[in-house]
Design a protein with these regions (language model features):
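Catalytic cores of glycan-processing enzymes that make or break glycosidic bonds
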Residues: 1-168
Length: 168
C-alpha cells in the first residue's frame, strides 16, 4: 500500500547477519537493494556472499559502514585468515588497504557504492564513527576542512569516471 501510494521508495535493506529465505523474498518483492560490506567478505572462503564476484546490480556496496571500523583499522585487527584471504583476493599486501577497498567498491557491479570520507582519506581507528552498543564517545569524528583538497576531488572524479559512477 505504501509503495502504491508513494512509488519506489529510497530504502536500503540492511540484510546483514542471519537472513532467512522469507526475508530475501520480501526484499526482492519490494525491490529494496541489499547491502554488501567488503569488510565482511574475507572471513570465510570463496563462497562468501560479500565478495565482489557475488555482488548483484540491486545492491549497495560499502568498504565498511558507520558501524564498522575504518578499513585501516579493520586491517589492523583482522584475523590472520582475513588478512591472508583479502591480500590474495585483492592482490595487495595491506599497505594501501583503504584505497584498495575504495577502488574495489567503485568497481563492483552493485548499482550504488557508498564510501566513507575516513576510508577515502585512509584514516585509522581513531576516525571510527560508531561502535554499536556503546552509548557514549561515538559520532564525534568530524571532517577537517583541510582534508577537502584538490587531490581528493581529482581522486573521487577519476574513480567516478573510471567506474561509470558519475551522475547522468
Amino acid at each position: 500500500a505504501v509503495q502504491a501510494a508513494l512509488g519506489r521508495l529510497p530504502v536500503i535493506a540492511e540484510d546483514l547477519g542471519l537472513i532467512t529465505p522469507e526475508v530475501e523474498v520480501l526484499r526482492r518483492r519490494f525491490a529494496f537493494p541489499g547491502m554488501r560490506v567488503l569488510q565482511f567478505a574475507f572471513g570465510g572462503g570463496a563462497d562468501n556472499r560479500f565478495l565482489p564476484h557475488y555482488h548483484e546490480l540491486d545492491s549497495v556496496v560499502y568498504p565498511g559502514t558507520h558501524d564498522n571500523d575504518t578499513c585501516v583499522g579493520w586491517w589492523a585487527t583482522a584475523t590472520p585468515h582475513e588478512r591472508e584471504f583479502a591480500a590474495a583476493y585483492l592482490g595487495v599486501n595491506g599497505h594501501d588497504i583503504a584505497a584498495t577497498m575504495v577502488r574495489t567498491a567503485y568497481a563492483s557491479v552493485a548499482d550504488t557504492a557508498v564510501v566513507s570520507m575516513q576510508d577515502l582519506l585512509g584514516l585509522d581507528s581513531r576516525a571510527r564513527m560508531n561502535f554499536p552498543g556503546q552509548s557514549s564517545g561515538w559520532w564525534t569524528w568530524r571532517l577537517p576542512p583541510s582534508a577537502l583538497t584538490a587531490e581528493l576531488a581529482r581522486l573521487m572524479s577519476t574513480l567516478g569516471r573510471l567506474y561509470d559512477r558519475t551522475p547522468p
